[in-house]
């Protein structure tokens, strides 16, 4: 492949959550459905609903899904997403942070993508509401992009449409993409694996806060 020519295909790192599903709709809008794939990682997460949602959405939208087992990470690190530990703040970041997870996801995605002739990688990381996760920062993504390009001598382009959006703005983007109700109804965010959300974990609270803020804003606009 001519490295100066951008492939007209894209792959989305996909968990079945609000952020990655919004990114999927963004990719579909830009690249067309037939040119988009998703990749999902089984890393030993404490519940299966995340994987089930991702599989259902991919099938429902007619998107090719590849599932990669990276559960070996459980053998070398521990946190509240892969154990039954109580979710809490642990110093400057919550104990739901999985060391190396996004670096691992991007590496495996890049390896797969190169084999498929895909250069554009979408990931739903966000620096605005990132809960203190260091691997959700823009500086990390840019660094990883350079590293992967050098490591594989390939012109990857890592896209982060949500990087500087609040959760309210992420809901607004889903609405602009015509996917608001789909994302609201079909995606899973809860750390505890509760269908429809537990309404108490940090992830649920952030999602609901953003949703309520966006709905209030929309309602205000209609009343003007």
UniProtKB/Swiss-Prot annotation:
This is 7-cyano-7-deazaguanine synthase. Belongs to the QueC family. It comes from the Bacteria. ATP binds at residues 14-24. Catalyzes the ATP-dependent conversion of 7-carboxy-7-deazaguanine (CDG) to 7-cyano-7-deazaguanine (preQ(0)). Keywords: ATP-binding, Ligase, Metal-binding, Nucleotide-binding, Queuosine biosynthesis, Zinc. The gene is queC. NCBIfam families: 7-cyano-7-deazaguanine synthase QueC (TIGR00364).
């Amino acid at each position: 492949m001519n490295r100066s020519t951008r492939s007209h295909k894209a792959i989305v790192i996909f968990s079945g959550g609000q952020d990655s599903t919004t990114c999927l709709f963004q990719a579909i809008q830009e690249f067309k459905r037939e040119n988009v794939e998703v990749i999902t990682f089984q890393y030993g997460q404490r519940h299966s609903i995340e994987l089930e949602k991702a599989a259902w959405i991919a099938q429902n939208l007619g998107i090719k899904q590849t599932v990669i087992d990276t559960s070996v990470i459980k053998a070398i690190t521990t946190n509240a997403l892969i154990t039954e530990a109580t979710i809490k703040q642990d110093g400057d970041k919550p104990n739901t942070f999985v060391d190396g997870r996004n670096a691992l996801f991007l590496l495996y995605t890049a390896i797969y993508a190169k084999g498929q002739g895909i250069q554009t990688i979408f990931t739903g990381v966000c620096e605005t509401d990132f809960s203190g996760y260091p691997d959700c920062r823009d500086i990390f993504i840019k660094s990883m992009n350079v590293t992967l390009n050098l490591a594989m001598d390939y012109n990857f382009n890592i896209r982060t449409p949500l990087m500087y959006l609040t959760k309210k703005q992420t809901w607004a983007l889903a609405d602009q993409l015509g996917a608001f109700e789909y994302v609201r109804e079909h995606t899973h965010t809860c750390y505890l694996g509760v269908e429809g959300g537990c309404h108490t974990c940090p992830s649920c609270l952030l999602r609901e806060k953003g949703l309520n803020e966006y709905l209030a804003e929309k309602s205000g606009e209609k009343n003007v």
